[in-house]
A protein has these predicted regions:
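Active-site substrate-recognition segment that forms the wall
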Residues: 33, 46-48, 52, 56-95, ...
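Glycine-rich FAD pyrophosphate-binding loop
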Residues: 23-43
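Helical element adjacent to the flavin cofactor pocket in flavoenzyme catalytic cores
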Residues: 148-155, 175-233, 237-240
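N-terminal Rossmann-like FAD-binding beta1-loop-alpha1 element of flavoenzymes
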Residues: 3-30
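C-terminal catalytic lobe of FAD-dependent flavoproteins
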Residues: 287, 331-410
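Dinucleotide-binding Rossmann-like beta1-alpha1 core, especially the glycine-rich loop
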Residues: 46-165
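Short beta-strand to alpha-helix junction loop
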Residues: 104-117, 138-149, 183-202, 314-322, ...
Length: 410
């Protein structure tokens, strides 16, 4: 029996697509190769950081990254080799690091950030239970130059709160005097991504959405301009519409005769317990070393580092040690109790713009990938966009696809 909608991928984007499609009255089946308990979305920092914060590729980032590489504090680590796509990615990254591109991207971030915030509110109204706080993002600066640069962008709209070192310590008690100050971006929020994922899974299962866990899609069958069959290692599944939301795994994208300019960026996190009085009062980002520190219900999580051009899925202890060393330079000594280390791959485009929309060849295939480190930030918005697109029937009929998809961005 042909299924109505098949979503391939059970991360935050896949589940958000399933949620929005279900809300429109569709019968949905989610196929996920793992057991759905520990994917990349679970290891996310949990930031909903769409507001007043620049994308990864922005003016000055190339020189700043080179400087940080000399200190072993760079957010990006490149494993150089004979991979042409890596060099294409780097060139596009450098090309995107200009004021015009950054201004446009930040405007889009705001538009779809609010869409995600609305979606999270709706999830909570639907009875989902997850840690969700709209208490801003604290941008902590360790370089005077970058702190002054950020202050110049602040206005009197209420979206910014400039803090000196003493005031910063009220929000982040463990910082030391090596920091320069901070800016609280008041519109941002944060969640516990694991709780979001589990709540979405439970809600969708109770709503009748079908989940095929531990079932890996290995190929497709094509007929004319349609995908006629989704081939898993267990069976062949037919569907009226297929949403491909497989994150950093390029294998299935290539099966559809596509090769997006996107790299699997390996990121790291450490989740631990610490005394309540020392925990950050809100989500925080050490902006100059690209390290997030996020409070949760019972724990704290730090996330950092993006490695490009590696397939090694094991935790690199050197990277973990480097994260701790970088953090220790700007904090008072404290103990990470019951620490859990994690790594995973994020689908990173060079300009933070995802690949969204109907496939150019196969009329029943929709792509939803490329959010990189912004999955939790924009996942719910992407779900809404993709669901609306499925009704519109064509990319050109959907303004959000035209605005926010890499298919329509130079």
């Amino acid at each position: 029996m042909k299924k109505e909608v098949v979503v391939i991928g059970g991360g935050i984007v896949g589940l958000s697509c399933a949620y929005s499609m279900y809300k429109l009255g569709h019968k949905v089946c989610v196929i996920e190769k793992s057991d759905g308990t520990n994917g990349t979305s679970f290891g996310n920092a949990g930031l909903i950081s769409a507001f007043k914060k620049a994308p990864l590729s922005c003016p000055g980032v190339v020189l700043d990254t080179l400087k940080l590489m000399l200190k072993n504090q760079a957010p990006l680590k490149f494993h150089f080799g004979l991979n042409l796509k890596l060099y294409q990615w780097i060139l596009k990254f450098m090309k995107s690091a200009n004021a015009k591109s950054t201004h446009r991207t930040m405007a889009l971030f705001e538009r779809y950030g609010w869409l995600s915030i609305d979606a999270y509110h709706q999830m909570l109204k639907d009875g989902m239970d997850f840690w969700y706080k709209e208490d801003g993002l604290l941008m902590i600066y360790t370089l005077e130059e970058s702190f002054e640069k950020k202050i110049k962008t602040c206005d009197n709209s209420g979206a910014y709160k400039i803090l000196n070192v003493k005031e910063t310590k009220e929000y982040m008690p463990i910082v030391n005097d090596n920091i320069c100050g901070s800016v609280l971006l008041t519109e941002n929020a944060h969640v516990d991504p694991g709780e979001v994922m589990r709540s979405l899974q439970e809600y969708l299962q109770n709503a009748g959405v079908e989940f095929l866990y531990n079932e890996e899609v290995v190929d497709f069958e094509f007929k004319n301009n349609l995908i006629d069959g989704v081939i898993t290692h267990k069976e062949k599944i037919q569907a009226e519409k297929i949403i491909l939301a497989t994150g950093a795994n390029p294998a299935l994208i290539k099966k559809t005769k596509n090769d997006f300019l996107m790299m699997g960026a390996k990121g790291y996190s450490i989740t631990f317990k610490m005394p309540e009085e020392l925990k950050p009062k809100t989500s925080s980002l050490f902006a100059d070393i690209f390290m997030a520190m996020t409070p949760r219900r019972d724990t704290v999580r730090i996330t950092s580092k993006l490695e490009l051009n590696t397939n090694n899925a094991l935790i690199d202890k050197e990277q973990i040690a480097n994260m701790k060393k970088n953090l220790a330079a700007f904090t008072q000594p404290f103990e990470m109790k019951d620490a859990i280390e994690w790594c995973g791959f994020r689908p990173l485009t060079p300009n933070d713009i995802p690949y969204l929309g109907f496939d150019k060849r196969y009329k029943n295939l929709i792509h939803a990938t490329g959010l990189g480190w912004l999955g939790i930030t924009f996942g719910p918005a992407i779900g809404k966009i993709i669901a609306d697109l499925s009704q519109d029937g064509a990319n050109e009929k959907n303004a959000d696809i035209m605005l926010f998809s890499a298919f329509f961005r130079d």
